[in-house]
């Protein structure tokens, strides 16, 4: 397969299964393919790969990170999703995304921060606040293990250093300002745990 061929990843996966080929050897030739490691419910690696966009197996989970970045003023770095995002366009959120094949949760959190908002987080300045396993939501197999990170960061923020175009703009906001965004329904609603689990000491 040539790199410039537009081949469906789903079809590739089926071809691999039919030919008993190693998917990793083939998918590397397909641009922009995001591959995840699969885990069981106990967070043990299954030794299987999964293509983003395909239906997850009922017994397979992937790692997801939410990354809250806080400065010494108690403000949080939040971002507005680009208008071309397929879900929640132009809504506000924290940094976040899926951990890709070969990464651990910390590596995924640091990569996502660089990709989305252009900041270089220091591993020692981060901590996992809590972990949640999400299964079936509204009849859909969700199957992820979500780590919620909090990083302390007082450095510069320049969206020009981001490596993707997923974010339209960024801002430092305090609890009350974030609450106002929620009240106007322009903050991703699944992040409402912020008030009880992330900024809980400021209640």
PLM regions: where:
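DNA major-groove recognition helix of helix-turn-helix/homeodomain DNA-binding modules
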Residues: 10-25
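Nudix hydrolase/Nudix homology domain
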Residues: 53, 130-203
């Amino acid at each position: 397969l040539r790199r410039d061929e537009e081949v469906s990843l789903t079809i590739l996966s089926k071809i691999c299964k039919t030919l008993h080929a190693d998917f990793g050897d083939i998918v590397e030739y397909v641009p922009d393919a995001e591959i995840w490691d699969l885990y069981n419910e106990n967070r043990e690696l299954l030794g299987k790969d999964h293509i983003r966009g395909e239906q997850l197996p009922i017994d397979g989970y992937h790692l997801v990170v939410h990354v809250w970045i806080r400065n010494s003023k108690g403000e949080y770095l939040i971002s507005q999703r680009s208008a071309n995002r397929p879900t929640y366009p132009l809504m506000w959120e924290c940094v976040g995304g899926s951990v890709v094949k070969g990464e651990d949760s910390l590596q995924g959190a640091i990569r996502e921060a660089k990709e989305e908002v252009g900041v270089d987080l220091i591993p020692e300045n981060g901590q996992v606040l809590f972990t949640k396993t999400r299964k079936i939501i509204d009849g859909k197999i969700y199957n992820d293990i979500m780590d919620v990170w909090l990083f302390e960061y007082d450095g510069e923020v320049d969206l020009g250093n981001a490596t993707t175009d997923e974010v339209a703009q960024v801002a430092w906001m305090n609890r009350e300002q974030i609450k106002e965004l929620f009240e106007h329904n322009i903050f991703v609603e699944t992040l409402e745990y912020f008030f009880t689990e992330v900024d809980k000491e400021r209640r």
